Amino acid sequence: MRLFVGIFSAARPNPTITRRASSFTFLSHKVCLSTMTASPSPKPNGNGSKKEIKILMLHGFTQSGTLFRAKTRALEKTIVKLLNPISLLPVFLYATGPNRLSPEDIPGYQPPEEPQAEDYQPDTWAWFRKDEASGNYRLLEEGMATISQAIRDAEGIDAVCGFSQGGAMAALVAAALEPERSLPEGKEGDWARGLREANSGHSLNFAVMYSGFLATPDSLQFCFEPKIKTPSLHFLGSLDTVVDENRSRALTDRCQDPLVLVHPGGHHVPVSKQWAAPLAGFIKEHGQDKEPKAEL
């Protein structure tokens, strides 16, 4: 595992480091915003020799694709700018989880003093719901089906990036798309087979997790045994009180040669240029196909 703590120079998109033990509406600079209606993925237009890197963005618990994009907009712009000189064009695809949350599901929720409209529903969603009694993930199959549809709508993806619960999902997606990984028979492996079909049997170039954590249900351990081979970058917040550091490190321990960065913040995606730079360097390193991808 490669572990780095501190601040990277924004002037160095690919910093020198040392090693230690769903549907889309296309916006400016090829950024995609998820909606809940189907539309086809657009074709390249006027990008010249730029290589597109399609990155599926998975939001956290109580968020949506729209909200996640709003929170990472500055990060998008910086990444696009840093990669422009080397002719890489990141395409950010935002999907929204299918499981709607009520206000009472939101941690720390307090009823408003003034009554709200009876039909009021916040834009809060989840990829799955944890059953506290059994530890299993309810509605995970629905979450994965939404991701599979997003991949089909995009005509395949090259990478995945997730925050918090979305980070846990990103790890599962990356693992499931590794063609050499054995999948369980029957229902337990159907969601993974659906992902492979959606991405035409292609593995991912890389995966990025912000405040991600290990999915612990026994039925999902095939994703971590053997370790995830897909190149992975993990951002941990030194002041994160929502996802305990041990939970995040349990995930990094299940990844082969992970790159781990610790930022001096809490439970959020750091979007400043100094933290966008190492992400841009990681995309630069792994964005190009190094060998033909395996087919099913």
Regions found by a protein language model. Give the residues of each.
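Short alpha-helix in the alpha/beta-hydrolase fold that links the catalytic acid
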Residues: A70-T72, Q221-F222, D244-D253
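Gly/Ala-rich beta-loop-alpha elbow adjacent to hydrolase catalytic centers
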Residues: C161-G166, A170
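Short glycine-enriched nucleophile-adjacent loop
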Residues: A170-P179
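Short beta-strand/loop motif that positions the catalytic acidic residue
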Residues: H234-L236
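C-terminal catalytic histidine-bearing segment of alpha/beta-hydrolase fold enzymes
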Residues: D257-L296
